[in-house]
């Protein structure tokens, strides 16, 4: 009986340690706001070029999107 109590206690302790390692700090990601680029001209073919123009406008990045392929700048709200 004493052996089984020790075994159950050890198994429960290992289980709690295993669960606790998966419960690290939770990070919350900021929302991303988008705004149409004012300086990008023409259809947006390269997301890299769009991101460079948006960096010059003071944004964090940019991407091409939409049917008409426009450049939209992105930043954290």
Swiss-Prot record:
Residues 1-30 form the signal peptide. The keyword Manganese does not apply. GO terms for cellular component: extracellular region; mitochondrion; plasmodesma. Pfam families: Gamma-thionin. Keywords: Antimicrobial, Disulfide bond, Fungicide, Plant defense, Secreted, Signal. One of its GO terms (biological process) is defense response to fungus. Disulfide bonds join 33-77, 44-64, 50-71, 54-73. SMART domains: Knot1. PROSITE patterns: GAMMA_THIONIN. CDD domains: Knot1. Expressed in the whole plant except roots. InterPro entries: Defensin_plant, Scorpion_toxin-like, Scorpion_toxin-like_sf. It comes from the Eukaryota. It is found in: Secreted. Confers broad-spectrum resistance to pathogens. Belongs to the DEFL family. This is Defensin-like protein 1. The gene is PDF2.3.
């Amino acid at each position: 009986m004493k052996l089984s109590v020790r075994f159950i206690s050890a198994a429960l302790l290992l289980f709690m340690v295993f669960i606790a390692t998966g419960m690290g700090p939770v990070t919350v990601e900021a929302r991303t706001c988008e705004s149409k680029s004012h300086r990008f001209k023409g259809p947006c073919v390269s997301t890299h070029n769009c991101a460079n123009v948006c960096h010059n406008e003071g944004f964090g990045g940019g991407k091409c999107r939409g049917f008409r392929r426009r450049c939209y700048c992105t930043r954290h709200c």
